[in-house]
Regions:
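Metal-cofactor-binding active-site regions of metalloenzymes
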Residues: 1-109, 113-118, 181-184, 194-195, ...
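Catalytic pocket-lining loop regions of alpha/beta-barrel enzymes
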Residues: 76, 89-204
Length: 204
């Protein structure tokens, strides 16, 4: 499963596939979809239908083999498992369209992440969630993997396979603990380790 980046990939699938002795398939990022839908004057019913349809079609077609979110770098990982209440998405989008604050963008993103996890379970694909380090403008404290504990062990979502990207570094102890106690939670060790001290290997 390959992340080709946003907004445009530097490499296409054919070019990457030609360099690797394995099948290469892209992952579906939800944040570009959310940004695109927010630019349109949609009712909540239209918004959620378009969101579901876009992800579902990508997964059911086999074009994408997983879903990815960088919600950590937008509104943080403190996502309540109760964010999928019937009214939260509607109320959040309405507040955003009327230019109101009150954490409406966070409420919308939390709601949509929970829905993405549900779709991952429906199509039996993994969910990748960025954790830990990111760009200079991120609030690192809100990127702590432990904020996801309540969500990932909630009965509705615990069956989803979840990959914690970047090992949660510098909170890799938290991420390692979660991968140990949550049977369907895993660590990505590809990018975090080059930026970490050699001791990080021993901790993980």
């Amino acid at each position: 499963i390959f992340d080709f980046g946003v907004p445009l990939p530097m490499l296409d699938i054919a070019e990457v596939s030609g360099q690797l002795p394995i099948d290469v398939v892209p992952i579906y990022r939800i944040e570009p979809l959310i940004a695109d839908l927010l630019k349109q004057d949609l009712t909540w019913a239209e918004f959620k239908d378009a969101y579901d349809t876009s992800i579902s079609e990508g997964l059911s077609s086999g074009l994408y083999k997983g879903v990815k979110s960088i919600i950590a770098y937008r509104t943080g990982l403190d996502v309540s498992p109760l964010s999928r209440t019937p009214d939260q998405g509607y109320q959040a989008l309405d507040a955003i369209k009327r230019g109101l604050g009150g954490g409406s963008m966070k409420k919308l993103r939390d709601h949509l992440l929970c829905r993405a996890i549900e779709l991952c379970m429906e199509y039996d694909v993994p969910m990748q969630i960025h954790t830990g380090m990111g760009d200079v403008e991120v609030n690192l404290v809100m990127c702590r993997p432990a904020y996801l504990l309540d969500l990932l062990r909630f009965p509705t979502y615990r069956a989803c396979r979840v990959l914690l990207v970047h090992t949660g570094y510098p909170y890799h102890r938290e991420a390692a603990y979660m991968a140990n106690v949550l049977p369907r939670t895993y660590l990505d060790i590809s990018e975090g380790i080059p930026f970490a001290s050699s001791a990080a290997w021993d901790i993980i």
